[in-house]
Amino acid sequence: VENLTYEMFYHLVTEFPHTNTNPSQNRPAQQFELAVRYLENNYTYNCTIEDLCVSLSLSRSYIYNLFQKFAHTSPQKLLTQMRMEDAKSKLTSSNQSIQEIADLVGYHDTFTFSKAFKRYSGYSPSTYRKHFS
């Protein structure tokens, strides 16, 4: 299940860099694209924003500025959104335990996952599964 916000990020990543022909002005857009791709490829692991910064050799403040400029959100919020949308999908389409789903979306502590999921969706994972399966 993809929501409208995730689709917006996908659109930004796939379309925005092609709208500017000046390579020096494209650099931040390309860095943003790389950052989003990194999160898409690694959100299922216990990756952090620090891991993203190290991977791209960029400072934390620069990464946050990129996300504010191109996505009007923080990288942490996008990372959480990716994890929670995947968790919502898994909760409604599989019989995997909440612990297994937490592990699959990058949380290795079920309590932390459950708190984050409730904050994101308004439901505990088990309640969400019951209501939306």
Language-model region placement:
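Short, Lys/Arg-enriched, Trp-marked, Pro/Gly-tolerant hinge/linker segments that flank
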Residues: 1-2, 6-41, 45, 50-56, ...
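Feature detects amphipathic, helix-rich regulatory segments
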Residues: 123, 127-129
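Terminal helix-turn-helix DNA-binding modules in bacterial transcription factors
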Residues: 36-37, 41, 46, 50, ...
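Short, highly charged
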Residues: 64
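Key DNA-contact positions within bacterial/archaeal DNA-binding proteins
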Residues: 61, 111, 126
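Core residues of bacterial helix-turn-helix
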Residues: 55-56, 105-106, 117
